[in-house]
């Protein structure tokens, strides 16, 4: 939940201090990181997903994109890869599987005028920043959850929607459910540590890269893993409450019902978009998006900016190139919050020797 209370910074030793926190590591967030570096701002990025790229990576990595200036055409994932390469010289930290939960004003250390912001994530990470730039696309992505009555009590222990630590699956019987790139990639990776991996999908075809599908079929043929066509029917457990453990998974298909012995279920059915906690940050919103001033792309709450699809204003165009423009202007205003006593010198990558050296010899 959000708060309007001005507060002293607790547990400073456990808090990351930087100039700007970028919420969202999709194309706009990645370009924003590059722009921050060009301006001399320190920044860190967080994303609710387990890797950079946002919708381009998670929903349509193979989709052709034709409206990026000077790029006649490229695949969505190729664009993400190029943006990662572009911002790599600045080596800004990226924190994945992190959802921005709350923001609070922090008492300034010195001048008593330019207050800073404390952002806390769902895992407890905290960031003490001069400004926040929200580049969260259509909102925070949340996993499509298993709709079986037994699932909620097992989530986080035996039912998972992301793989955050491969070692926890060592020696386990793992069922990976899904038919996209993430499901195939993790099934293939987990087969190297798990006692047995079964990939479960409702049909023979996949929405995944041909190479991954071929590798999976070869692994099945070699006896390294299993592939079952069907849908989740029930989760059978032992124990109760927090001591409940997954024992078996009931699979339903046209051929009937079968039961798989399983210790862990990794359900990778894709993502759904939701506004998330950001909608409760006491900013003016329009249809789930952040209303911004188009001269600075700052929200109604001082120090919080928005760029990309999450930003709302009259005649807003939901284009990646629009997000690039919005982020560039937002960071110029954010610079004044980070360095209130300094004037921003207009920087061009072509005529700044130090910057040019950094970008060409990274």
From Swiss-Prot:
Its EC number is 1.18.1.2. The keyword NADP applies. The keyword Chaperone does not apply. One of its GO terms (molecular function) is NADP binding. Its cofactor is FAD. It catalyses: 2 reduced [2Fe-2S]-[ferredoxin] + NADP(+) + H(+) = 2 oxidized [2Fe-2S]-[ferredoxin] + NADPH. It is an enzyme of class 1 (oxidoreductase). InterPro entries: FAD/NAD-bd_sf (IPR036188), FAD/NAD-binding_dom (IPR023753), Fd--NADP_Rdtase_type_2 (IPR022890), Ferredoxin-NADP_redctase_2 (IPR050097). Binds 1 FAD per subunit. Homodimer. This is Ferredoxin--NADP reductase 1. It comes from Cupriavidus pinatubonensis (strain JMP 134 / LMG 1197) (Cupriavidus necator (strain JMP 134)).
């Amino acid at each position: 939940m959000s708060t309007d209370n001005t507060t002293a910074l607790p547990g400073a030793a456990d808090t990351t201090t930087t100039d700007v926190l970028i919420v969202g590591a999709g194309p706009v967030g990645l370009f924003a990181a590059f722009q921050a570096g060009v301006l001399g701002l320190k920044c860190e990025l967080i994303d609710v997903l387990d890797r950079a790229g946002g919708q381009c990576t998670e929903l349509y990595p193979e989709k052709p994109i034709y409206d990026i200036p000077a790029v006649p055409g490229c695949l969505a994932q190729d664009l993400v890869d190029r943006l990662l390469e572009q911002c790599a010289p600045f080596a800004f930290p990226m924190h994945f599987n992190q959802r921005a939960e709350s923001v609070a004003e922090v008492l300034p250390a010195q001048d008593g005028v330019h207050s800073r912001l404390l952002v806390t994530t769902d895992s407890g990470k905290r960031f003490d920043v001069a400004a926040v730039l929200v580049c969260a696309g259509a909102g925070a992505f949340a996993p499509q959850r298993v709709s079986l009555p037994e699932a909620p009590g097992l989530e986080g222990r035996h039912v998972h929607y992301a793989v955050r630590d491969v070692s926890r699956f060592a020696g386990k019987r793992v069922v990976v459910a899904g038919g996209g790139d993430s499901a195939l990639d993790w099934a293939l990776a987990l087969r190297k540590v798990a006692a047995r991996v079964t990939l479960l999908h409702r049909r023979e075809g996949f929405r995944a890269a041909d190479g991954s599908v071929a590798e999976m079929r070869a692994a099945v043929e070699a006896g390294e893993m299993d592939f079952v066509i069907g849908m989740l029917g029930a989760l059978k457990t032992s124990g109760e409450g927090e001591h409940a453990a997954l024992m078996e998974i009931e699979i339903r298909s046209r051929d009937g019902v079968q039961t798989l012995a399983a210790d862990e279920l990794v359900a990778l059915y894709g993502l759904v978009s939701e506004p998330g906690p950001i909608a409760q940050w006491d900013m003016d919103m329009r249809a789930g998006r952040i209303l911004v001033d188009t001269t600075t792309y700052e929200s109604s709450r001082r120090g919080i900016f928005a760029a990309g699809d999450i930003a709302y204003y009259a005649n807003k165009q939901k284009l990646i190139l629009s997000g690039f423009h919005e982020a560039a202007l937002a960071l110029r205003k954010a610079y004044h919050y980070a360095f209130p006593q300094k004037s921003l010198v207009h920087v061009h990558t072509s005529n700044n020797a130090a910057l040019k050296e950094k970008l060409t010899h990274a």
